[in-house]
Amino acid sequence: MRIILLGPPGAGKGTQAKLISEEFSIPHISTGDIFRANIKEKTPLGIEAKRYIDNGQLVPDEVTIGIVKDRLTKDDCDNGFLLDGFPRTVAQAEALDEFLKGINKELDVALLIKVPEEFILERMTGRRVCTSCGASYHIRFNPPKIEGKCDICDNELIQRKDDTEATVKERLEVYSKQTYPLINYYKDNGIISEVNGTESINEVFGNISNILGRDK
């Protein structure tokens, strides 16, 4: 089973990716993780990627594609994989398809977790983190017993910079510009499947499992 996981920031992709990986015994491949691994191991591609990152630049497609291709040749990908964070553009999607075709494989499904913008804004801007122990809360879904105070250590709770409304809206705008053409690309290829990401974790995973069961 070869899967692409798509969805906006705050859609719960990380949670679902872990569940899918465990249920279907395939590696969860996050581009962020493999970038960090290559940089840590000082591979040629990792060194090149670090140069762009250190200068505050986007890593070019050819470097990103090279790192992903290298990861997909590992033995644990023989029976499938779950890609999270790649591809981000149609050019990357085309390069991935070309690579898979070269090894007589193809994608089975592109899973899109759909969540309305207002739901994501509420989910992300409501998050709070303890400045001391790192415990996580949500002002609506998982509030602390005392407002602004950690239940565990009684220290202050803060909103991370990534979770401010302005930052979240900016991330959603970038996602829309990048990903809508990608969604249309996979629709044209007939492999996109959509799930409602506003439901509970178990309900979302149940719907995903039904889709993946059909596509086996």
UniProtKB/Swiss-Prot annotation:
It catalyses: AMP + ATP = 2 ADP. GO terms for cellular component: cytoplasm; cytosol. One of its GO terms (molecular function) is ATP binding. SUPFAM superfamilies: P-loop containing nucleoside triphosphate hydrolases (SSF52540). AMP binds at residues 31, 36, 57-59, 85-88, 92, 160, 171. ATP binds at residues 10-15, 127, 136-137, 199. Keywords: ATP-binding, Cytoplasm, Kinase, Metal-binding, Nucleotide biosynthesis, Nucleotide-binding, Transferase, Zinc. GO terms for biological process: AMP salvage; nucleoside diphosphate metabolic process; nucleoside monophosphate metabolic process. InterPro entries: Adenyl_kin_sub (IPR006259), Adenylat/UMP-CMP_kin (IPR000850), Adenylat_kinase_CS (IPR033690), Adenylate_kinase_lid-dom (IPR007862), P-loop_NTPase (IPR027417). Zn(2+) binds at residues 130, 133, 150, 153. Catalyzes the reversible transfer of the terminal phosphate group between ATP and AMP. Plays an important role in cellular energy homeostasis and in adenine nucleotide metabolism. Monomer. Consists of three domains, a large central CORE domain and two small peripheral domains, NMPbind and LID, which undergo movements during catalysis. The LID domain closes over the site of phosphoryl transfer upon ATP binding. Assembling and dissambling the active center during each catalytic cycle provides an effective means to prevent ATP hydrolysis. Some bacteria have evolved a zinc-coordinating structure that stabilizes the LID domain. Belongs to the adenylate kinase family. This is Adenylate kinase. The gene is adk.
